[in-house]
Structures are given as C-alpha cells and as structure tokens.
From Swiss-Prot:
Binding site for [4Fe-4S] cluster: 5, 13, 16, 95
Example of a GO biological process term: rRNA base methylation
This protein's record includes keyword 4Fe-4S: yes
HAMAP family named in the record: 23SrRNA_methyltr_RlmC
Protein's name in the database: 23S rRNA (uracil(747)-C(5))-methyltransferase RlmC
Catalytic reaction annotation: uridine(747) in 23S rRNA + S-adenosyl-L-methionine = 5-methyluridine(747) in 23S rRNA + S-adenosyl-L-homocysteine + H(+)
InterPro entries the UniProt entry points to: 23SrRNA_MeTrfase_RlmC, MeTrfase_TrmA_AS, MeTrfase_TrmA_CS, SAM-dependent_MTases_sf, U5_MeTrfase_fam
Gene3D superfamilies membership: 2.40.50.1070, Vaccinia Virus protein VP39
Keyword Lyase found: no
Keywords recorded for this protein, A-Z: 4Fe-4S, Iron, Iron-sulfur, Metal-binding, Methyltransferase, rRNA processing, S-adenosyl-L-methionine, Transferase
Gene, per the UniProt record: rlmC
E.C. designation(s): 2.1.1.189
Cited function: Catalyzes the formation of 5-methyl-uridine at position 747 (m5U747) in 23S rRNA.
Organism: Actinobacillus pleuropneumoniae serotype 5b (strain L20)
Catalytic residues, chain numbering: 349
Amino acid sequence: MILNCPHFQQQDCVSCQWLEKPYATQLTDKEIDLKRLISPFILQNFTEILPPVQSSQKQFRNKAKMVVSGSVERPILGILKDQTDPQSGIDLCDCPLYPTEFEALFPILKDFIARAGLVPYNISKKKGELKYILITQSRYNQSIMLRFVLKSEQKRPLVERELPNLLAKLPKDSVVSLNIQPQHAAILEGETEIFLTEKTTIEENFNDIPLFIRPQGFFQTNPNVASQLYATAQNWIKDLAIQQFWDLFCGVGGFGLHCAKALQEKNENVQLTGIEISASAIASATKSAEQLQLKNITFASLDSAQFALNEKSATPDLVIVNPPRRGIGKPLAEFLNQLGTPYLIYSSCNARTMAQDFEALSNYSLQKVQLFDMFPHTSHYEVLTFLVKKS
C-alpha cells in the first residue's frame, strides 16, 4: 500500500479506493481510460499526448470536510460510516491527505467546540447544532478559511464569545464564518453565510497570480497540480495571435487571468471576458484582475451557455471552457462549433462528458492532450486539451 492508512486497512474510510494500487499503475490506468474515451479524436501525426502531470501522494489536499459527531465534550471530526447512525463516527484527523498544519488545528477545533457548547447534530434524534466543519488552507500564506455549518444561529453568541481565543491560535489573515443549514438532510451547506471576521476571503497564489477563495465557491483541492494546470494553459496560448478571448465557467478566474497576463505582456489591448454563474467567484476574479493591474478585463456573473448563445460581439480568437462534471452540453458545443473561433481550450474533470462534447465540435481538431493527476488514489483526473479550427 502506498500510504499507511489504518482507516483504509480497516475499511472505515474507502474514499481512496485505489490506495492499494502502486502510483505508477494508477497513472497508467488513468491514461488508458483517457485514451479510450478520446480515441475517436486522436489524429495520427497531429495530436500530441503529453506525459501526465503527477501529484504528491500525500498531504496534497488544501481542504477538509469534516462531519461532526460524538459529544460536545468529545467531538469526532471525520465521517459517519453509516449515514443514518450518529454513533458510527470515524475520526479522520490523522488522514494522510491533509497538509501537516491541520494536525495542530484539529485539537484547537475540538477544544473550541466544547467551549462554545456546539453540540454535534444527531441525525436520528434531529437534535444538536454543529453539522460540519469545512476547512480550506492557502498554500501561499497558510491562512485558513474555517466554516462551522450549524442548524441555526442559536449558538452564535457563545461562538462570538470564544472567537478571540480561537483567532489567536489561527494563522494570520484567516477567515471564520457560520453557515446556517436548517434542513434535516445530508446537505453540506446552506445559503446563509455569517462572517465572524473582517476578512471574507483567503488569498492563494499560483505562478504570481493572486486568487481569492470565498465560502461556497469552487476551488481546486490540489494546489500544486492546479498551479501546473493553469501554467500549462498559459504556455500553450502565449505566442498565439489573440486579440480577445472568453473564459467560460471561469470560477475565480484561474485560466483567464493566467492567459491574460501572458498575452498582455506582448499586447496590452488583449481583451478577456470571463463568465461564471457564481457572483462571489466573479467578485474574487475581479479583485485578482485589479491587483494584477490588468486592463480590458470583464468578469460577469451569468450562465456561461446563455452568455455565449446570446453574445453579439465579434468572434473571440480563443474560448476557454472549464465546465462542471456534466460538461458544456450539446447546445453550447454546437454553438461553439459554428462560432468558428480559431482556438479552444477545454479543461475537464470528467473525460467522458468532454468526449461527448467533442462529438459536437466536428469543425475542430484535437492538437494537445495532457492528464493532470488532481485526485490521487481515485479513478478521477483532470484533463487539459487544446483544439484548433480545421482549415
């Protein structure tokens, strides 16, 4: 076994379903899967399949999603082995995927739970307050975003009373919030976010690009591999004749900002339009662009497919898409196929739906493919592709 994980050995936690596979075998199996899915689009003497980007095999995650069970005096942070049994809590504070700094953080959180009287939510009795603790770390400055998911605001005064003591033990520039999730259901978070700190974002930095992480927003879980993913996209397009481009499903702007920075070093008039449904992600992307002092950048909170289908301005020279697992979908794929932009970058966490989208992109040839092992010890992976319009 690659990692010594007693939880896997005892079959208490099987999230890392490939833990018994040697790492080289994991990568080979992922490459075989990817090539099988995209084989209809691989062109001899044209499509370049680059070697996979490897991950660290431990301590690569920047976040933890901990179910809280046990008692207020002795909370258990980890998972429920049986979702319907509150007594089935498994403590995962020693999970080898977490950064080393989390080791010191978990005892601080357990102490805080007791001091603030945050009784763990009991799913069978429908009683208690604290459901989850969600933690994200910045690799850049080690600051922490700490979110307590509660059933109600009832314990807020006690939390605020104990907060100064907690903040004194957290890294500088950390963010603490309460997320209110009143439903009796296995839903990770609710809509209401109450910030207990002045700061509402933690700053990450990939390749000298500041990126701001907010609650309820998507951010890659493997920062070392993610930074290489963005740098690769930047490298692929930096010498192309691009005057304007779109970044669809842009999140906090990782792809668009990397590409805009490289392109504007040669031509400051290059224009970027970034589109993302999440308003908080767009606020983060806008903040990054301002900090980088980039010009001609527009980020807007819209549905990516609706934006593209209704946009009447000039055809962009490049479109970047980084959709969720479901892919970009047939209507958007067919639209992009007719739009005729010279270059497409498609980044995907689900090669199966990406391959389905490629079927509709019949006017394009697949020029480059690279696998990024964002999720070691599982069957999942990220893939970056570069497509060019057929002449």
